[in-house]
């Protein structure tokens, strides 16, 4: 096979082996360049794509290409950058490399005052449970911990609902930086505390010291940036701090409960800067991730939590990690008090009020109302026979949400929409595909989940 066509043939085979989302996100954007008879280089747009493909797909790609080319000696390698122009043989991709523009932390030989990072040393990557809902965010976080200041992810803007692990990941990144660079000036601060710090500086006539302090940081990690809303003077000062850190290649990481453009009463020039780097969502964990979180937390608490009990809890508490941890803490406290084994009956009795509240909060009727309002249609439209795209897509999303967020069976969901269970089953299969293929649908899904989980 002609090596120049080999990559496209490889992609065709990969279509049957990886998800459509992974194919479009990680593999299709790669550019192939034949550099020798037995060597093909795949160019990745940035260090994160390169690292992810190397870890998860390179061995698979090499095997497929060797088989297609009938050449076991064929080598596939990855580089960060852009494929060189064909006529410029000796050109080197002009890329944003760590060695050129990332932060080069220098030890402070005579620091008179110990710098406080305010990082929680218990929040690490090792105890951050990975799932589809946070996989990309965690991968980017790990890369930034190793190479802070990478231009393609500066700033790194992390958004998602309450209790999904944004703060944990923020601390994990900071702790990761310090593990490699102990003298780095890494600061974690909540947006409210930043405002209080500024107010105190103004009151004490110490704004010069305030500005100098923040502009001297190697990495600034600000949690819940949405709290800057309506705080004009805070936004003004943060704008200048942001510019100073950004221009000198210092890492900025921000979290919010919503997408940057959706934060109200924040200056447009700030929101624009929030999107200069990489913006990534953390979504509510899926069932498998919720089970893994419960088992991991139980292990940390030396609890003997049977897997079927973890499934029982995870199937009923779906909104966020904090809710799962709270439920597990209650189960542990009750076991410490009563003794005995933890089984489903024990958990059902211990969590009966929480489970009952969850059933009341998220109902099919509530989902229908929220979806109808979101798409500006009527609830009756969701139950109608209309096949208009403006109705069918919201209807499918509402059905998939009902399956995700309630314990109702497919026939029960179908009856609520005046449909049979096969229609619901089809919606539950199609909506994940839509979310993978269309970012706007994925954004709608995340917004609806946040609204229903609030």
Swiss-Prot record:
Residues covered by region (Domain II): 80-117
Annotated spans, Domain III, AAA+ region: 118-335
Molecular function GO labels: ATP binding; ATP hydrolysis activity; DNA replication origin binding; lipid binding
BP-aspect Gene Ontology terms: DNA replication; DNA replication initiation; regulation of DNA replication
Pfam families: Bac_DnaA, Bac_DnaA_C, DnaA_N
Free-text note on domains in this protein's UniProt record: Domain I is involved in oligomerization and binding regulators, domain II is flexibile and of varying length in different bacteria, domain III forms the AAA+ region, while domain IV binds dsDNA.
Name the UniProt record assigns to this protein: Chromosomal replication initiator protein DnaA
Native organism: Haemophilus influenzae (strain ATCC 51907 / DSM 11121 / KW20 / Rd)
């Amino acid at each position: 096979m002609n090596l120049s066509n080999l990559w496209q043939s490889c992609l065709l085979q990969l279509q049957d082996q990886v998800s459509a989302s992974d194919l479009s996100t990680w593999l299709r954007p790669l550019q192939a360049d034949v550099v020798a008879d037995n060597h093909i280089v795949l160019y990745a747009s940035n260090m994160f794509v390169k690292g992810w493909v190397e870890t998860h797909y390179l061995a698979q790609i090499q095997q497929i290409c060797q088989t297609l080319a009938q050449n076991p000696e064929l080598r596939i390698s990855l580089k960060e950058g852009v494929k060189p122009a064909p006529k410029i043989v000796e050109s080197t991709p002009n890329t944003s490399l760590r060695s050129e523009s990332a932060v080069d932390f220098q030890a402070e030989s005579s620091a008179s005052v110990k710098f406080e990072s305010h990082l929680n040393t218990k929040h690490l990557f090792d105890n951050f449970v990975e799932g589809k809902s946070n996989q990309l965010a965690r991968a980017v976080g790990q890369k930034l911990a190793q190479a802070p200041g990478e231009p393609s992810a500066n700033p790194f803007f992390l958004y998602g609902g309450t209790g999904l692990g944004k703060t944990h990941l923020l601390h994990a990144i900071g702790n990761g930086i310090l593990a490699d660079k102990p003298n780095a000036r890494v600061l974690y601060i909540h947006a409210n505390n930043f405002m209080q710090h500024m107010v105190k500086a103004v009151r004490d006539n110490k704004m010069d010291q305030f500005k100098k302090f923040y502009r001297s940081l190697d990495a600034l990690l600000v949690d819940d940036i949405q709290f800057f809303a309506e705080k004009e003077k805070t936004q003004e000062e943060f704008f200048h701090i942001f510019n100073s850190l950004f221009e000198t290649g210092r890492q900025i990481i921000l979290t919010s409960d919503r997408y940057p453009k959706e934060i109200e009463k924040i200056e447009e020039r700030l929101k624009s800067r929030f999107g200069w780097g990489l913006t990534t969502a953390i979504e509510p964990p899926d069932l498998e991730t919720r089970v893994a979180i419960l088992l991991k937390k139980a292990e940390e608490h030396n609890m003997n939590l049977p897997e079927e009990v973890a499934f029982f809890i995870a199937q009923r508490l779906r909104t966020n990690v904090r809710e799962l941890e709270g439920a597990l803490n209650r189960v542990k406290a009750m076991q410490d008090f009563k003794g005995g084994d933890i089984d489903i009956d024990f958990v059902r009795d211990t969590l009966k009020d929480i489970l009952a509240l969850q059933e009341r909060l998220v109902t099919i009727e509530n989902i229908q109302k929220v979806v109808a309002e979101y798409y500006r249609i009527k609830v009756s439209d969701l139950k109608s026979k209309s096949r208009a795209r403006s109705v069918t897509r919201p209807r499918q999303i509402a059905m998939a949400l009902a399956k995700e967020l309630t314990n109702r069976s497919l026939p029960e969901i179908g009856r609520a929409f005046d449909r049979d269970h096969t229609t619901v089953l089809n919606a539950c299969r199609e909506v994940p595909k839509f979310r993978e293929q269309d970012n706007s649908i994925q954004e709608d899904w995340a917004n609806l989940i946040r609204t229903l989980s609030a």
